[in-house]
Amino acid sequence: NVKITTYVDGVAYSGGYAWASIADEVVVNPMGRVGSIGVVLPLTNYAEKDKKEGVKRIYITSGKSKVPYDEDGNFTEDALDEFRKSSKIIYDEFVGHVAEMRGIDRQSVINTEAKTFDAQQALSLNLIDSIMTKEQFYNHINGKYGENVMSLVQKSNQGEEVVTTTNDSLISTLTE
C-alpha cells in the first residue's frame, strides 16, 4: 500500500491536475496554481479561407461519419453534436475522477467552472492539502520519512520532475 505525495512547484492545470489529484497528499508552492478541470476540443473551420484561396477539398469516404465536414468544408451539425457528446463524457469522467481522488462532491468540482486557482484558493476548495515552499516540502518529507529517501530526477524541456521513493511512498515533484 504505497502512499503518494505530489509537490506542484509551478502549475498543474487540466491533465496535470488530473495526475496530481491521484496523490494521497497534494502540496503546492505558495506561488503555484492548479485547476482548469474542464475539456476543450479546438476545432478550426478553414472553409472561408479555402474558398478565398480557391481550394476545394474532396473527400472519398466509406461510412457516413468518417469526415466531419459538409461539401462546403463546414462542420456538419451531426459532427458538432458528436464532438459535444464526447466533450461531455470526458468532462463527466474528469469531474468524477477529481471528486473521487480528492474526496469532494461532484458539484463542488463542477462549481470550479474550469477556472485556475492560486494556492490559497485551491486550499480553500480542497483541491490541495497544503501550501509549502520547496524547502518546507523537503523538510516535511524528511520529517515524514527520515533518511530513507531515494530520488530519481528526470529533466525535460517542459521542466524538471523529481520522483522520490521510500519503502512505502512515492513523492512526485512537478517543477517548471
Regions found by a protein language model. Give the residues of each.
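C-terminal intrinsically disordered, low-complexity extensions immediately downstream
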Residues: 135-155, 160
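Well-ordered beta-strand positions
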Residues: 24-25, 85, 114-115, 129-133
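A mature extracytoplasmic/lumenal domain signature
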Residues: 8-12, 129, 135
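Secondary-structure end/capping motifs
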Residues: 87, 91-121
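Small-residue-centered hinge/linker elements
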Residues: 1-2, 11, 17-101, 151-154, ...
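Glycine-rich beta-to-alpha transition loops that act as phosphate-gripper elements at the mouths
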Residues: 7-13, 111-115
